[in-house]
Amino acid sequence: MSAEASGPAPAAAECLESPSPSSVEPGSPSYSLKPLTPNSKYVKLNVGGSLHYTTLRTLTGQDTMLKAMFSGRVEVLTDAGGWVLIDRSGRHFGTILNYLRDGSVPLPESARELGELLGEARYYLVQGLIEDCQLALQQKREKLSPLCLIPTVTSPREEQQLLASTSKPVVKLLHNRSNNKYSYTSTSDDNLLKNIELFDKLALRFHGRLLFLKDVLGDEICCWSFYGQGRKIAEVCCTSIVYATEKKQTKVEFPEARIFEETLNILIYENSRGPDLALLEATGGAAGGGGAGRGDDEENREHRVRRIHVRRHITHDERPHGQQIVFKD
């Protein structure tokens, strides 16, 4: 009788059983956790919803937190589907596993992703990967302070290629003494040198934000050009012809304040979306001094170039006695 009574019990128990674990998503909370099967050579990992299937040999090959988990030193619990649950982001766990298999992995290019991977490597105590990530981040930080390289323009075509290949605003200094047909005034050589020295100082100060070009083949003697988003925004010409004696002379000026002003103005074009029109107006931007009315066409205004030809009054000491000074651009 006891045998008959016990007969239908398994069937009844079977009817009360939950659905097969294979039909439920890994990590479902409807199942209680249980210890990992000790004799298994393979491990199913659920890391923050990212599923991975690997071997115990991979997980225990290096002295990491994963080795401590799967070498028997720490009890590891699985869900009903046999998945080991790890409460971490699974975004970089595949990279962690590849490093444990091969001893090296290609690292992300992004500094942000490198930092994320470094955080995961520290959590899992993967010392070799920690060192690789730290070295890569250090190299990226060093690249953030780039070398101060100043290309020298050798042709108009090369200049256009340089302008098209950079997203930075551009400052170009053209200086070419061989263009002079006349003698220089007494201060011209000194002023030409001052322009070159200022260009070098600006390049050292702003080379991370601006591209500096040097042109020694152009048609001017000394001229600054400022470019934003591939087009010329302003130009400061530092030379003029002086009729001070019986012969013409070339005068080179050093408009330091104007050069500083235009350099700061061109920084507005660092933003890839272009300068703010209100800021452009406030700084005298493309309007070239604010003389134009608000009714001017905005597109024409954007494409104007501020051309400043320096004209400084000659002091009494520089003016030859009895001679009238005439400037001609």
UniProtKB/Swiss-Prot annotation:
MF annotations from Gene Ontology: identical protein binding; protein domain specific binding; small GTPase binding; ubiquitin-protein transferase activity
Keywords annotated in UniProt: Nucleus, Ubl conjugation pathway
Keyword Cell inner membrane tagged: no
Disruption of the gene: reported phenotype: Reduced synaptic transmission in area CA1 of the hippocampus caused by increased levels of RHOA. Brain size or neural progenitor cell proliferation are not affected.
InterPro entries, A to Z: BACURD1-3, BTB/POZ_dom, SKP1/BTB/POZ_sf, T1-type_BTB
Alphabetized PANTHER family for the sequence: BTB/POZ DOMAIN-CONTAINING ADAPTER FOR CUL3-MEDIATED RHOA DEGRADATION PROTEIN FAMILY MEMBER, BTB_POZ DOMAIN-CONTAINING ADAPTER FOR CUL3-MEDIATED RHOA DEGRADATION PROTEIN 1
Stated family: Belongs to the BACURD family.
Name assigned to this protein: BTB/POZ domain-containing adapter for CUL3-mediated RhoA degradation protein 1
Organism: Mus musculus
Gene: Kctd13
